[in-house]
């Protein structure tokens, strides 16, 4: 059940509630980095409900076929959202975690490479998929997941995240691919 009728002001107020509930942890995992921790949002049933409802309201009329969630925190929101929208959920996992035939997409990290993978039968050609993660920083994981879904024939309708750190450039890279992007909260450098 949606908690709000969907007016812009109410959506903005609810997004601000989510933002205020996210914990900022300075100097973690390394000095100079401020980690944005969504666990307080997940621990508070009202705020978690509001977060999910923000996504449900946005996507309930999009004629989606599936929700894909990026390992690992994208699973939490993505699976709940898929349930609320009465859709299937597809995990986009870190390489080596899925038991069946997989297809992988590599992406660059600051000090090396990583990969995400999906089962080869997880999406069908032409299916309309929403891709969800918790946070967009440099965008590498989300971009790899988009490429992977497209390689399997999916139409990535939109990428969505709870948090965007636009100063790290990931959201700009995602939108540059032509994939629309929705984020609930944005943090600027120094916030």
Curated annotation (Swiss-Prot):
Gene3D superfamilies reported in the protein's UniProt record: 3.40.50.2020
Where in or outside the cell is it found?
A: Cytoplasm
Single GO molecular function: adenine phosphoribosyltransferase activity
- UniProt function note: Catalyzes a salvage reaction resulting in the formation of AMP, that is energically less costly than de novo synthesis.
Q: Which SUPFAM superfamilies match?
A: PRTase-like (SSF53271)
Similarity field: Belongs to the purine/pyrimidine phosphoribosyltransferase family.
**Record protein name field:** Adenine phosphoribosyltransferase
> Any idea of its EC number?
2.4.2.7
Tagged with keyword Glycosyltransferase: yes
Family matches, as NCBIfam families: apt, PRK02304.1-3, PRK02304.1-5
Q: In which pathway does it act?
A: Purine metabolism; AMP biosynthesis via salvage pathway; AMP from adenine: step 1/1
What do we know about how this protein assembles, alone or with others? Homodimer.
BP GO terms, sorted: adenine salvage; AMP salvage; purine ribonucleoside salvage
What's its catalytic activity? AMP + diphosphate = 5-phospho-alpha-D-ribose 1-diphosphate + adenine
Domain of life assignment: Bacteria
Q: Which top EC class applies here?
A: transferase
**Gene Ontology terms, cellular component aspect?**
cytoplasm
What InterPro entries does the database record attribute to this sequence? Ade_phspho_trans, PRibTrfase_dom, PRTase-like, UPRTase/APRTase
Keyword Cytoplasm belongs to the record? yes
Q: Which UniProt keywords apply?
A: Cytoplasm, Glycosyltransferase, Purine salvage, Transferase
